[in-house]
Structures are given as structure tokens and as C-alpha cells.
Amino acid sequence: MATDDKILLRLANRVGIMGLLMLILPPLLAAWVYRGEAGESFSFLTHTLSELGRYDSSRLAVLINGGMFFGGLALVVSFSSRALSGRSTPISVSLAISGILLSLSVAACGLFPVNVGALHSHAMTALYVMTPVCALFYCFAILRDIPPRWGVLPALAAAGCALALLLDPDRELMLMDRYAYGLFGADRPTIWWPALTGWLLVLFVGIWLFYALILMRRRH
């Protein structure tokens, strides 16, 4: 491999890891300082990612939305750099495509927070649709040529969570601004399954993208 290619791939690795950190760390910080409209603390069991990115009620909403947008774009750059390298194969390109499309969907959710209404609903719905689509590309690459086979598990789990949210009959209502507050007020249930499922989706997508970055690095 040429020296320039090595430098490019090393930079792509660092950009990808930085992108993942921008997706992971902001929700933890924002949840820590969050106070809802009813004065309640944040719970990953009852509050959604959309609420954490709501500008009027979340103190660090700009960190959440900026992290998703710029983190998603950083991952797009990372996967694209690997796909365009001289040693790419059809299998590695398939792996990169899944990462690029999924990262773009994540970036769109950060660009359009819940305060913008319909655009946020469209962005989240696109994420729910693209997750199983990207999982097909990813699983094809893993099962065809890139062991170990258990690497498909986070993608399959993410696809399952995304489909559950996509097929929920109340999906459009749940993606509306202040829907949870109007539904529960200050008395939220111990577990609100749409919120928990949404965070499981975020968790599995994060593991999936991290593992995809590792696989792409190994193949180069």
C-alpha cells in the first residue's frame, strides 16, 4: 500500500472514531443535566432521543443535535474514504455503503430536531427505513466474505428495533413535538416502550457502526 493511502486510511480511522464519540457522549451529558417541562429528570426508559434534542427543554440540545449531525458526517467521510481506497473490493464497498447510508440518516436526525415538526418526523422515519435496508448490505458483506459471522447480530437487532418503531400505529404522533408531555405530564410510566426501543436502536446502531469501522480497518 502506498504511503499516501496509509495516511488517508489512518486519518479515516480517526475521523470515524471521532464521529462515533460525537454520537455517544452528548446524550450522556445531556441526560445528566436534563430537566423536562414537568421538572422531571431524564430517564432512558421513559424519555426519547427527540426530547433530549428539543431546544426549549433540553439544556444541551445543541450538543445532541450537533453531535448527531457532525458525527454522522464524520462517519460518512470515514466510510467513503475506505470505499474509495485502491484496495476496495465489492464486499468492502457493500460494507461501506451500509455505513454511509446509515450515517447520513443519523446526520439528518440531528439536522432536523423535534422543534421543526414535520421535517423531524420525516428524518426519523427515514432512519427507521434505512436501518433494515443498510442491515441487508451489511449482513451480505459479513455472511459472504467477512468473518466472524456473529458480527451481524447488532445490525439485526437494530433492524428489529427500527421496524418495531416504523410499524407502530402511533409513530407519527410519537414523533410530534411535546407528544410525551401531553400524554403523561409529570407522571410517566416506569417504562415507556417506544422510548426504550428508540434507545436500544441507538445502542445497536452505535455497536454496529463501531464494528463496521473495525472490519473496514482490518481489510485495509
Task: Report the location of each language-model feature.
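Terminal transmembrane helical module of multi-pass membrane proteins
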Residues: 138-220
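Membrane-proximal helix-loop-helix units in multi-pass membrane proteins
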Residues: 99-149
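Interfacial helix-start motif at the membrane-water boundary
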Residues: 50-73
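Membrane-interfacial loop-to-transmembrane alpha-helix junctions, especially the N-terminal start
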Residues: 89-99, 147-155
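Interfacial/capping segments of alpha-helical transmembrane domains
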Residues: 31-47
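N-terminal signal-anchor transmembrane alpha helix
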Residues: 7-36
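Hydrophobic cores of alpha-helical transmembrane segments in multi-pass inner/ER membrane proteins
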Residues: 20, 67-77, 129-138, 200-215
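C-terminal TM-helix exit segments that contain a strictly Trp-centered aromatic cap at the helix terminus
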Residues: 25-35, 108-113, 160-175
